[in-house]
Design a protein with these regions (language model features):
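N-terminal "arm"/small-domain region of PLP-dependent enzymes with the aminotransferase-like
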Residues: 1-46
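Solvent-exposed alpha-helices and their adjacent loops that cap or buttress functional pockets
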Residues: 9-10, 64-66, 89-90, 135-138, ...
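Conserved N-terminal alpha-helix of the aminotransferase class I/II PLP-enzyme fold
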Residues: 32-84, 100-110
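A short helix-to-beta-strand connector/capping loop
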Residues: 67-69, 116-121, 166
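PLP-dependent aminotransferase-like
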Residues: 80, 88-143
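A short acidic, amphipathic alpha-helical/loop segment
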Residues: 84-85, 110, 156-161
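Active-site phosphate-binding strand-loop segment of PLP-dependent enzymes
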Residues: 127-172
Length: 172
């Protein structure tokens, strides 16, 4: 299941500036074109609130999100969105928390410590850098796991262990 080492890919990317950062910029990008009136200002300031509101409204418009749907900006990229989903969706079903690196362990800790779900949580863990037996998870439980363990260098190679007829939610 785990990729513990790495080998050089056979072809190099045309532009190596991709990943979680630095990211490849759009054609014609120039840092001097960025507005700086919010630099050093809190998101709670008048200008910060205005800028966030504009970004949210623009997002709704560009993505054609229905008027009666809510849209928001969540900090911390995927981590913030994952936490938001956990806090709003976990609870009705038992939880299988699968972790083998720091993000997954943090999400398990939040489910127990902050959400108080310890009585309905089963842990599937393995030493740092290896995967637990993911096939042992229950199709009727919600599952928490990190698909690409960036802190440990271990990723799940496939999702064959997730049942096609599952009734629980899958968080990854």
């Amino acid at each position: 299941f785990a990729i513990l080492g790495s080998s050089m890919p056979p072809v190099r990317p045309k532009n190596p500036e991709f990943s979680s950062g630095p990211c490849k910029k759009r054609p014609g990008y120039n840092v001097s074109k960025l507005r700086t009136d919010t630099l050093g200002r809190s998101h709670r300031s008048k200008v910060g609130k205005q800028r966030l509101k504009k970004a949210i409204l623009d997002t709704k418009r560009i993505l054609n999100i229905p008027e009666d749907y809510l849209c928001g900006i969540v900090p911390a990229s995927d981590t913030g969105a994952y936490e938001l989903a956990m806090w709003n969706m976990l609870g009705p079903k038992p939880i299988d928390a699968c972790y083998w690196e720091s993000f997954g362990q943090g999400w398990k800790t939040d489910a127990v410590t902050h959400l108080g779900l310890q009585d309905q949580l089963t842990e599937y863990t393995a030493p740092y850098g290896t995967l637990p037996d993911l096939a042992s998870t229950n199709k009727d439980h919600d599952i928490l796991f990190t698909f690409n363990g960036t802190t440990s260098g271990v990723k799940v190679l496939d999702l064959d262990w997730i049942s096609d007829d599952r009734t629980g939610l899958t968080f990854n």
